[in-house]
């Protein structure tokens, strides 16, 4: 039995070898025999002079260069993001601080009839100058609030601080214009030629500003602000722009003040004797 099994196993080996040899013969015959007219071989036909190793090396170079560029760019992005995140955090902190200061200013600015904890505290001329710059850039005019129904009504809630800021800004604009005109006149009078002359002028110069625009304060301040916004020079006419003539504004204002202060009898005596009185002015 053992011999039979060995012989049988040997026969199986022979049959396997013969089958494998037949398959190899078929492959060789298929490769050696010319393909049929419509058949396509399972390999790519490259043009003559084409080097596949060169193509592979280029592709590998591109992949390696692309990976290195991406890694360097990612590092650069990380380096850029880190310093960018720091100022962003600082800016957010500054915004929070500014918001808290603004809220505290608003709370302290509110009051009834000037009853505030600190008159020279958060509400100062510096804040009004900042608001003045904003007003000039936004092309807004100057004037009191129109909230009260009549002139005798008491201001309530935010009307008081609004009118106070409008008044301070209008007076500051008028004083600024007068100061500029006075500084120009002083420069044209002394005409410094060197630093020593300029230092002497600064030490000896004394400018006194008197703001007395009368009821035309809002018009004068608005005209000066529009001139500054439009880049026009500040002239003396802007200080009396509320009336048709500059000199006439001062004289008419003086006459109106004088007529209010003078009694009625003196005003009647100043009239010409030859001029007839109107019927409405006669006393009955």
Swiss-Prot record:
Domain of life: Viruses
Post-translation changes: Highly phosphorylated in the host cell. Packaging is selective for underphosphorylated forms.
Biased composition (Polar residues): 115-126
Keyword Phosphoprotein tagged: yes
Coiled coil: none
The keyword Phosphoprotein is annotated on this UniProt entry: yes
Amino acid composition bias (Basic residues), ranges on this chain: 94-108
InterPro entries: Herpes_UL49
Keywords: Host cytoplasm, Host Golgi apparatus, Host nucleus, Phosphoprotein, Virion, Virion tegument
Main location: virion
Composition bias type Basic and acidic residues, residue spans: 74-83
Family of this protein: Belongs to the alphaherpesvirinae VP22 tegument protein family.
Subunit composition and interactions: Interacts with gE (via C-terminus); this interaction is necessary for the recruitment of VP22 to the Golgi and its packaging into virions. Interacts with gM (via C-terminus). Interacts with VP16; this interaction allows the formation of a tripartite complex composed of VP16, VP22 and UL41/VHS. Interacts with the capsid-binding protein UL16. Interacts with host CGAS.
The protein's name: Tegument protein VP22
Species lineage: Viruses, Duplodnaviria, Heunggongvirae, Peploviricota, Herviviricetes
Gene this chain is encoded by: UL49
